[in-house]
Amino acid sequence: MCIRDSDYPYSKVLPNALVTVKPVDDGSYFLQLDDSTTLLPVNMTSSPFGQKEVRALVNFDETNESSGIYSKAVNINWIDSILTKPIAPDLGVTSNDSIYGSDPVEIVNDWVTIAEDGYLTLRFRTIWGDRNKAHFVNLLTGKDPENPYEVEFRHNAYGDVYGAYADGLVAFKLDSLPDTNGKTVKLKLKWKSFDGDKSVEFNYCSRKSTPAKASIAAERSALNLK
C-alpha cells in the first residue's frame, strides 16, 4: 500500500525547538527551552546522551501529564544532538592558524544561530567535497583587551575546499567568558567569510536566552564535524 503525501506527518519531521539537554544527579534529565521554560520528557526517562550536557534539536508534543518542578511535560518524537564544544585554548597566532585553520564560512542568520542559556549556537555554511572527511570547527576568545566578550569562529577544512555548499551546526559553551552578573552585554562574533572578514553582535547574558527567529530550519546538520 502506498502512503499518500497528505498522510505523512510533516509536523514530526522538522525540529520545533532548540534546547539544552541537562542531566540530573538521579540519572534523569530535563530540557531547557529558554531562560524560564523547562521541559520534562515523560516518554524518554534517561538521556540518550548519558551524563553529557549538550545542545540539541528536538521535536516534541506537550502532554497533560504532571511535570513536577518543571514547566511542562512533553513527549519527545525525536531528538538530535548538536556538536557541543568549549571555547578552544589560544595557541598563539601561528599555531592558531595551523591547527584551527582559517578556511572561510558564512554564518547563516536563522533561528538556530543564537546566544542563549550560556551557549553560542551557530548554523554555518561552507564548501564540502568529501562528506566523509571531518572539518574542524572551534571558537576562540578575541584579541581585544577592552572587550572580553569578543570571540572568533575558526574552521579548518583540511584541504577539502572544492565541492558544494552545505550547512553545519555547532554549539559552544561560553562559561569561560566573564560572568555578566545578570546584565545583558554585546557578544561580538568574528569570522572569515568568502567575502573577507565579518562580524556580528548578539545580546548575551550568562545562562539567559535571547529571542529566536520564528522560521524553522529545513534540515539538520548532515556534515562531518569535530
Regions found by a protein language model. Name each.
Residues 12-226:
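First exposed extracellular module after export/assembly in secreted or surface-exposed proteins
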Residues 1-6:
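Conserved small/polar residues in nucleotide/adenosyl-binding loops
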